[in-house]
From Swiss-Prot:
Superkingdom of origin organism: Eukaryota
Sequence positions that bind Ca(2+) 2: D102, D104, D106, K108, E113
Residues that bind Ca(2+) 1: D19, N21, D23, S25, D30
Domain EF-hand: 6-41, 57-80, 89-124, 130-159
Alphabetized Gene3D superfamilies for the sequence: EF-hand
Pfam families with a match to the protein in the record: EF-hand_5, EF-hand_7
Entry-linked SMART domains: EFh
Name this polypeptide is given: Calcium-binding protein F-like
Source organism per UniProt: Dictyostelium discoideum
Keywords on record: Calcium, Metal-binding, Repeat
InterPro entries noted in UniProt: EF-hand-dom_pair (IPR011992), EF_Hand_1_Ca_BS (IPR018247), EF_hand_dom (IPR002048)
Length: 171
């Protein structure tokens, strides 16, 4: 499923959760009523939560939530989630990579082992085959360790999240 489809579905879920009168649009009043219901009639907490959510989503402060405003909120939320999970996901990526490419089982990849990763995807990463060492091999020992791989995968995930957020939704 592509990113725009996911964002569209998130927006639809948002509208379904907060559009209590089912008129197809979400206003700050809809948000307030939804929170009031979820907070068992606690006016103070509902007002507070509404204020926080509205100040986060309603960028033009008109009391209404456009598709673009809700989609931007969903993209930013997804970016934060990716960033929070980047460390754990990177470790899983590293484990999978080591299982497949660490032929001598020394828990690090030689230049040859590392380049197999890229060849398996149909390309060589750089015109200068040693350039990966300059980028990933932080301790300059000629091999890529678990920690170096984890940092590399983590950075790739965070860069991806940043790119998604910067590009934003197609409105």
């Amino acid at each position: 499923m592509n990113n725009n489809r996911k964002i569209f579905e998130e927006v639809q879920n948002f509208v379904q959760n907060y559009d209590l009168n089912k008129d197809g649009s979400v206003t700050s009043y809809d948000i307030y009523l939804s929170f009031l219901k979820k907070m068992n009639g606690d006016v103070y907490k509902a007002s507070q939560a509404t204020g926080v959510l509205c100040s986060t989503i309603d960028m033009d402060h008109d009391g209404k939530f456009t598709y673009c405003e809700i989609a931007k909120y969903c993209v930013d939320k997804a970016k934060k989630q990716i960033e929070q999970n980047a460390e754990i996901a990177a470790l899983a990526d590293v484990e999978a990579m080591l299982l497949r490419f660490d032929k001598d089982k020394d828990k690090k990849l030689s230049q040859t082992e590392f380049l197999e990763y890229f060849k398996g995807r149909g390309y060589t990463p750089y015109s200068d085959r040693d350039q990966y060492l300059k980028i990933i091999d932080l301790d300059k020992d000629g091999c890529v360790s678990v920690n170096e791989l984890q940092e590399w995968f983590k950075k790739r995930r965070i860069d991806y999240a940043t790119m998604l957020s910067a590009r934003g939704p197609n409105c």
